[in-house]
Each structure stands twice: as structure tokens, then as C-alpha cells.
Amino acid sequence: MSHSDQTSPLEARKSAALSGTARVPGDKSISHRALILGALAVGETRISGLLEGQDVIDTGKAMRALGARVERTGEFAWTVRGVGVAGFAQPEAPLDFGNSGTGCRLAMGAVAGSPITATFDGDASLRSRPMRRIVDPLEQMGARVIQSHEGGRLPLTLQGARDPLPITYRTPVPSAQIKSAVLLAGLSAPGVTTVIEAEASRDHTELMLQHFGATLVTEPEGAHGRKISLTGQPELRGARVVVPADPSSAAFPMVAALLVPGSDIVLTEVMTNPLRTGLITTLREMGGAIEESETRDDTGEPMAQFRIRGSRLRGVEVPPERAPSMIDEYLVLAVAAAFAEGTTVMRGLHELRVKESDRLEATADMLRVNGVKVEIVGDDLIVEGKGHVPGGGLVATHMDHRIAMSALVMGLAADRPVKVDDTAFIATSFPDFVPMMRRLGGELA
């Protein structure tokens, strides 16, 4: 597998005011898609700002194994010379995606539209995650699962369709990964492939497909949904991609600055796609001092600079329809809620149960061992904020990078130090997290 068995425990202690300017790593969602669409395009794709975390590196290796030329040309700068839609070569060995659910699931869609057979594998965490809802629509399009672990889990061998069929598919849950897998498979199908979602999920795939030259139409569907129609068999052309800073990674220094009194930090070039800014909306509702400036738009994705200052937060109710726009940020939001005055209710968090760990239970455990009163009712998380957190707990990270970072953020403002059992997996999304937080003034040792 991609990751070592060595653990790296770490402790976060109450810190003086955080200050300084930082750029968090490139957005993970955009980085995966840039590599995959670059591999499916004809000609050269030049990527700047790529996240060089292990998850994205594993996706790059997989694209190389499928026949694309993927090269690092400088810091965060990469080029991909693609093979064209349906042009993937038969890989010689299983494709190992490490801890990356996004890379694995999107690549399944791309492979489903190519006349090849590929085996998908990953680490113990990825092997435990559900793949059935990804492959169900792909099988409707003509792909076939030849072999998989119990319950449709990895390792899974997928035979791509020789003649893929366009379908109209209604996603069972709001999921950018399901939608993206169907659209990527639909590139190889003649006619129009349509995805209908009751709740709009992240639209990075749609924006980037258009950037690479695909014909795609998005229409509203019902109160909160979308209908996406892709015309198949385009010739995607290599493109220039500027990867904005990842808002899911920016969430950690952002919340830390709100919680540590007197803090004043600036985060630059953070993506502000409205389907990714649920956390910022929520933190502002809680009373967080977050100012936005210097907005710009490169290669289809908006970005801005944020100034964040220490704030007294209050409890709020977070509606379930906000979940798709901040599904990865609930862990660190729960930390903010623990320091707020009053109760915060986060509704409709079922999707947290099928992430790198059962994040709903893991979040509750992280708070409880540090003296916070928390309750799970169905798919709702209820946190009783008291304005401070006792701390002093040891947090089990369950091989989950976001649990590790959330717990360390909590320790920077808690009464007593907070320790995490392992920080090794932080490298999957935010390799520079610990050094960056130290540069801003965080006490991590």
C-alpha cells in the first residue's frame, strides 16, 4: 500500500495570537480532475498550483499507468500529455489509489468508458469504503465488475465498455463523485448523458469539462437540484489549469484564527466556488470576523483573499441542504461549535459515515475526550458550546487526516493540550499543515 505503518503522534497547546499570511495547498478536487481530464485530452495540459499531497500523487501515478505522460516541471507545476477520450492503455498492474476516494472513483468513471480492464486498490481505509453506488451507473453504461471484495469494495476489477451507452441517471445521494464518474464515462458514449441530482453537489467536474472543450448544459431541477447534460465523444483539448487554494484545507487555519484570541491572519487565493463555501457562511453566522477581498477568476474557478480575526462565536443551526457545500468541513466546524456560546445543531450528516472513517462518530469522540458535551441524534450532530474547551484528551485519528487536523486546531485554544495518536495521514491533503501552523504562531510539538 501507499502509506507506511509508522505513526507520528503530536500535541497542540494553547497558543498566543496567530498572525501572518499563508497560502494553503492547491484544491484537492481540482488537482485530481486536472490530472484525469489532462489524461483524457489530446495535447498538453499545464497545471500550476497542483496539490502535491499523497492522494493527488497517487492519481497522477494511475494516469501514467493508463498511458498518459505525467511530469513534474517545477514546484506545484505539472504537465500531462493525454491519450484522448477512450484512449487509455491496459495497465500492467493494479492501480493503487492509497487513501484517495476521489481519485479512485473518478478514475473508475474514466476507465468505464475505455475498452480496457483495470484493477482498483487502495489502503485499508479506502478498502473499507463503499464503491457499489459508483459502479451501479457505470454498469448501466456497459462497464462490468469482474471481481470485487465483499459488498463491492476494493480491490475491484472493472472492465470498461467497448461501446458505452449514454444514460439518464438520478443520483441516490448528493455526491460529486457519483456525478463525476458518470460524466467521465459519458465522454466516451455517443449522444447525451444526463445526471439529475436532487441537491446540487460540487460542480468542479462540469466547469473543468467545459474548460477542456466539452459541450455541457446545466439546468435547475426542483428546489435545490440540478440536471447536467453532457454531449458525448468530444475531442478534449489540453488546457492551462490554475489550481486555487483548497477551501477545505483553508478551514483549519481559518477556524484556528477565530478561536485563538487576538489572532489576525490572511489566507490568499482561496477558492470561493459557491458550492464550497458553506463553512465560511456558517462561521460568519456564528459571529466570525472573516473579510473577503481581491476576488478573481482563473480557469473557471473563483478565488479570493480572506482576513480572519479572533472572534467570540455563538451556537447556530446548520440546515441539511448546506451539507454538500461543506461535507469535509463539519469536523473543524464541530471544533468551532465547541468553543462557541450556546448549542450548535448540524443536520443531515449521513455522508460523514462513509468517509475515510465514520466521521460522525469520530467527531463526537474527539470532542468527548476533550470535555465537550456532544450528542448524535440520527444523522444530526449536536454540540453544546461553553465558550471554552477543557482539552487534555488523546484523539484517535482512525487514519483520517481531517480528524487529526481538527483535533490539533482544538488544542491551540483549549485549556489543556490536545494530543493526536497519528499525524502521518495529514500528508494526503495538507503536507505543509504543521509547519504552516507553526509559522502562524501555533504551539505544535
Swiss-Prot record:
Belongs to the EPSP synthase family. This is 3-phosphoshikimate 1-carboxyvinyltransferase. Monomer. Catalyzes the transfer of the enolpyruvyl moiety of phosphoenolpyruvate (PEP) to the 5-hydroxyl of shikimate-3-phosphate (S3P) to produce enolpyruvyl shikimate-3-phosphate and inorganic phosphate. Pathway: Metabolic intermediate biosynthesis; chorismate biosynthesis; chorismate from D-erythrose 4-phosphate and phosphoenolpyruvate: step 6/7. Residues 1-25 are annotated as: Disordered. It catalyses: 3-phosphoshikimate + phosphoenolpyruvate = 5-O-(1-carboxyvinyl)-3-phosphoshikimate + phosphate. PANTHER family: AROM/DEHYDROQUINATE SYNTHASE, PENTAFUNCTIONAL AROM POLYPEPTIDE. 3-phosphoshikimate binds at residues 28-29, 33, 175, 177, 328, 355. It is found in: Cytoplasm. Keywords: Amino-acid biosynthesis, Aromatic amino acid biosynthesis, Cytoplasm, Transferase. Pfam families: EPSP_synthase. The keyword Plastid does not apply. The keyword Zinc-finger does not apply. PROSITE patterns: EPSP_SYNTHASE_1, EPSP_SYNTHASE_2. Phosphoenolpyruvate binds at residues 28, 101, 129, 177, 359, 402. The gene is aroA. It comes from Rhodopseudomonas palustris (strain BisB5). GO terms for cellular component: cytoplasm. The active site is at 328 (proton acceptor). It comes from the Bacteria.
